[in-house]
Amino acid sequence: MLRHKNGSWRLCNTLIDVLCLRAERQPEDSACSFLRDGEQDEVDVSYRELERQARAVGAWLQQNVASAGQRVLILIPPGLDFLAGFFGCVYGGMIAVPAYPPHSTRRTRLLSRLEAIAENAAPAAVFTTAELLPAVRQIFERTCRCHAIDNLLATEASELSDRWTSPAVSAQSLAMLQYTSGSTGAPNGVMLSHGNLLDNSEQIRLYYEHSQASRVFSWLPPYHDMGLIGCILQPLYLGCPLQLMSPMHFLQQPIRWLRAISDWKATTSGGPNFAYDLCVDRFDSGECAGLDLSTWSVAFNGAEPVRAQTLDRFAATFEPYGFRREAFYPCYGLAEGTLMVSGGWKTAAPVIEHVQADDLGTGRVVSVPVTSTGVQSLVSCGRSIPGQELKIVDPERCTECPPATVGEIWIRGPSVTHGYWQRPGLTKATFEAFMADTGAGPYLRTGDLGFLKDGELFVTGRLKDLIILDGRNHYPQDIELTVEQSHPGIRRGCCVAFSVDQRGAERLVVLAEVDRAYWSGARMEDRASKRENGELHDADERSVTLNRRSLILKAIRRAVSEKHEARVAEVLLLKPASIAKTPSGKHQRRACREAFLKGALREV
């Protein structure tokens, strides 16, 4: 249900109901604006116009696709055309399949992912843009119909919108397939119903304390749950303003994100942990003149481990510009749970728990003072959303863990989705878990590890990524953080740790990308020093490089040994962009491990 300006209630079972309602109640209000250059070049669309576009695209699908319930692949760059494509699929009674469009600089990686998605989803049609249509046709023309949505909207929208007929969809009907990032394997299509999307939208509204006075800004990719459900569907559900920016414009200049929040007076915006680190790493006080972040009341942080150090760095850097530490909103979610699983209090600062790292490695949670030796600071991801049951479960025994114990996070509730498209075996293993002692269920096995304390959820890592050395558990993200902090030449967020079997024992392997600018600068510095001391006569580029490599390798091994009491069996120093990541920026540890075992990684 949705509350409206006049205080009345109206039942909405589908996304079609919601957009129709907005076009009826707020026809001239802006549904979305988009910064085409990431700064000032703004275009927008009203609810009335977006609903008209959705009808037109839906009618085209009804005329050109065999039957309702077919999958439609959406390969459209971020912007207003994406919204028309997504809602057009919904209005046509189809199942939307958003995915990254082919891009020349990432063509090989994206092509293999697209092929895997297409093989599983078997789309009946593909929507893209006129600019990308030739490339998309090369990939898909033999298997399905490809169409440029901008051409359709420019030439046929008025005529088509009158031909639309409301499809027979309900809350139980599938609205979209959300393909997982593939951080632990091939992408799987999570089946989300209209009911899933509306239920989770309501939970987000409650936990963010949103209203029609809220203002949402996002640079997040619309192809993933956080960008699409949390930042595009949420404002539509609320009837509040939304402004978007391309992820590329953010990555090129992170200040654009903060400047947009300031200029547009956004109340809600956020991203993964790395986005906050990037803002601090690229901080330039000269670019921040006049910056005002005082309206930013929900700075959500999720999709990857939330680091206490990141929160401290960002708050210290941007508090002079009006940012409040209480605005930080760490949260936890996953596509299989639609999006949000847990979140904190809007007006409270994040909850930090300081624990003994050694005990955490054995699955025990022992709280200690922050000044203790071997302390690890964990950020709470808040409390379970209303109407959902969340338990910490022993993943092998399938029984609930005792207090102060790490286990797998299991959930059940109306936001839990319908399984994986065309993957019955994986669906049963993941979505149909039962307690061994009580028979309670079914639960969704998230594959994530964590613990509860005073109702707060602390996520510690991924079950499949866990590294076990000499009987002790190590979370790869903890080792990766230690590695990246061990030497200034290592790129932030570009380290991977995993284990391999060597002669019947698990051994630790670390991959670390070396910063190109630092490497070049260090090399020049060494050469200048040798030249000044008259030592350059027999020193060539290779000897200088080997010297720098040795320093970094020693720093990594020493840091991991001291912090984790673990021996690194092998370290590979790599060029930037060598480490495999998902389109959303998560490490693909399994792919990295396979590349290592195949000898496919090239060291600097």
Please provide the spans of the model-predicted regions.
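Conserved pre-ATP/AMP-binding loop-to-beta segment of ANL
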Residues: 27-30, 160-186, 196, 200, ...
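Conserved AMP-binding/adenylate-forming core of the ANL superfamily
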Residues: 32-84, 104-112, 168, 189-198
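AMP-binding/adenylate-forming catalytic core of the ANL superfamily
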Residues: 126, 262, 269, 413, ...
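Conserved AMP-binding/adenylation subdomain of ANL enzymes
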Residues: 198-215, 225-267, 282-287
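Gly/Ser/Thr-rich phosphate-binding loop
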Residues: 266-270, 282-375, 389, 397-398
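Conserved ANL (AMP-binding/adenylate-forming) active-site segment centered on the GW(Y/F)…HTG consensus within
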Residues: 357-378, 396-399, 416-447, 480
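Conserved beta-loop-beta connector loops within the AMP-binding
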Residues: 364-410, 454
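AMP-binding/adenylate-forming catalytic domain of the ANL superfamily
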Residues: 493-494, 506, 558-587, 600-604
